[in-house]
UniProtKB/Swiss-Prot annotation:
<feature type="binding site">
    <location>
        <position position="155"/>
    </location>
    <ligand>
        <name>GTP</name>
    </ligand>
</feature>
<dbReference type="GO" id="GO:0051301">
    <property type="term" value="P:cell division"/>
</dbReference>
<feature type="binding site">
    <location>
        <begin position="25"/>
        <end position="26"/>
    </location>
    <ligand>
        <name>GTP</name>
    </ligand>
</feature>
<dbReference type="Pfam" id="PF00091">
    <property type="entry name" value="Tubulin"/>
</dbReference>
<keyword id="KW-0616">Plasmid partition</keyword>
<protein>
    <recommendedName>
        <fullName>Tubulin-like protein TubZ</fullName>
        <ecNumber>3.6.5.-</ecNumber>
    </recommendedName>
</protein>
<dbReference type="InterPro" id="IPR036525">
    <property type="entry name" value="Tubulin/FtsZ_GTPase_sf"/>
</dbReference>
<dbReference type="Pfam" id="PF21493">
    <property type="entry name" value="TubZ_C"/>
</dbReference>
<dbReference type="GO" id="GO:0003924">
    <property type="term" value="F:GTPase activity"/>
</dbReference>
<keyword id="KW-0342">GTP-binding</keyword>
<keyword id="KW-0378">Hydrolase</keyword>
<dbReference type="GO" id="GO:0032153">
    <property type="term" value="C:cell division site"/>
</dbReference>
<feature type="binding site">
    <location>
        <begin position="208"/>
        <end position="209"/>
    </location>
    <ligand>
        <name>GTP</name>
    </ligand>
</feature>
<dbReference type="GO" id="GO:0030541">
    <property type="term" value="P:plasmid partitioning"/>
</dbReference>
<feature type="binding site">
    <location>
        <position position="185"/>
    </location>
    <ligand>
        <name>GTP</name>
    </ligand>
</feature>
<feature type="region of interest" description="Disordered">
    <location>
        <begin position="403"/>
        <end position="435"/>
    </location>
</feature>
<comment type="subunit">
    <text>Forms filaments. Filaments bind to TubR. Binds to the TubR-tubC protein DNA complex.</text>
</comment>
Length: 435
């Protein structure tokens, strides 16, 4: 989804005014990148606003901010050294400064249509502050959702446990707020590795933050930037309803050339579209998960040259049947064909599909993380037990019960004894000499 959509940015209008409340190092970096998104909209070059909340004072220095006027930093004083991956410290820091944070929310997000709480699950500050931030916005009746990154399996056990602990708490209360957008770091890391095999490891963070920001920004542009081809439309108000739907939200995108869309033989492109839905942009879904969705929408964008030929009754009917098959129980599932009047010559043969599916259950990736935690614990226990047994066996095999033997008393030796003649009974014994 992220990537080449400059022609949208150059002429596009955003559907909703987003505010981003970034928590912790990861959450602040994502929120700042979202606030860095630019448009050519007059008097609204930077359409999003962000509040960055963190403990570690050094983390702010790592974040690039293009326009300081739409980003506010809040340093949680007294916790400048960070939370050391301890969520309890992060929660404590947020509570101590909650009044200051809420004042910033009221000032910065007063005109926002929707607020995203952004957080990298697994650390201390963001993970710890997350539940308190949810409570704060919920109690003051804000429309908000969550933008959360899931850790890779390569992360330490504590990180994985911190993440799943917070997901469990969120799942218990998810009906109280809007959509949850999950970002699978394992998926994005693989994509980064494939696209940039010679890149430095520290470039991934910048790549992933931009990828996330681009994905959300692009779908927010699609719903307000193009000319509807028919009466069926997926407008800003409908988009707002979708992201206010409790549960997990999935975004998907597919680009095809117009000659790949044969309405008389639709199996090929419908299969590709189905795969795109399941792959998603930010995390993978399974078909069974999609079938439990509450809302879905499919937007299609192409050039004026191709729109007149492609958007016939047969094609749109195929799209309706496709989305009905994939999301059979949703409340709404609009199909919205659009014409991009500003398509470049290079892209006039391209057809783009954008899907939004809301109200989904937690994905299999969360289950995979739990399985990884279980595996690590079991292997650690086995390794510790094996090492302990080896030491004990060696210890018990060692005989340290040898009794001390009393040293034998040394015999005195004064040299050879003088020969003594046996006295004859008939003669007196010879007197010994005495010196």
């Amino acid at each position: 989804m992220a990537g080449n959509f400059s022609e949208i940015e150059s002429q596009g209008n955003i559907s909703l005014k987003f505010g981003f409340l970034g928590l912790g190092m990861g959450g602040c970096a994502i929120a700042a990148e979202c606030a860095n998104k630019e448009t050519q909209i007059k008097n609204n070059k930077y359409p999003y606003r962000a509040i960055l909340v963190n403990t570690n004072s050094q983390d702010f220095n790592k974040i690039e901010i293009k326009n300081t006027g739409n980003v506010r930093k809040i340093q949680l004083e007294g916790y400048e050294q960070g939370a050391a991956r301890n969520p309890q410290v992060g929660e404590e820091a947020f509570v101590k400064h909650e009044t200051k944070i809420f004042e910033a929310v009221k000032q910065e997000f007063e005109d926002r249509d929707f607020i995203w709480i952004t957080c990298g699950l697994g650390g201390g500050t963001g993970t710890g502050a997350l539940l308190k931030a949810i409570e704060m916005l919920y109690e003051h009746d804000y429309n908000f959702g969550l933008l959360l990154t899931l850790p890779r399996d390569a992360e330490a056990l504590k990180v994985l446990e911190n993440a799943t602990s917070r997901i469990r708490s969120i799942a218990m209360n998810q009906e109280a707020f809007g959509s949850i957008v999950l970002i699978d770091n394992a998926k994005l890391y693989r994509k980064f590795e494939e696209e940039n095999p010679s890149a430095l490891a520290n470039e991934y963070t910048s790549y992933s933050n931009k990828y996330i920001a681009d994905a959300l920004h692009e779908i927010n542009l699609v719903t307000s930037s193009f000319t509807p081809f028919s009466d069926t439309h997926f407008d800003a108000s409908e988009f707002a309803q979708v992201i206010n739907t409790p549960g997990v939200l999935s975004l998907a995108k597919l680009e095809l050339k117009s000659n790949q869309l044969d309405t008389e033989n639709p199996l090929g492109y419908l299969t590709q579209l189905g795969n795109a839905l399941e792959k998603g942009v930010l995390y993978d879904t399974e078909r069974e998960e999609l079938e439990s969705a509450k809302k879905s929408a499919l937007s299609i964008v192409t050039s004026p040259l191709r729109a007149g030929r492609l958007y016939n009754f047969s094609f749109l009917n195929q799209m309706e049947n496709f989305l009905k098959e994939r999301t059979p129980y949703v409340d709404e599932r609009p199909i919205a064909p659009y014409v991009n009047k500003h398509t470049t010559k290079k892209e006039e043969d391209i057809v783009k599909f954008y899907s939004v599916v809301a109200g989904l259950p937690l994905p299999k990736r969360v289950s995979d993380i739990i399985d990884e935690i279980t595996r690590i614990k079991e292997e650690r226990e086995q390794a510790n037990s094996k090492k302990s047994n080896a030491v004990l066996n060696k210890l018990f095999a060692f005989d340290d019960s040898v009794q001390e033997e009393k040293p034998k008393k040394k015999k005195l030796n004064f040299g050879a004894e003088p020969e003594v003649e046996v006295a004859d009974d008939s003669q007196p014994a010879k007197k010994k000499l005495s010196f």
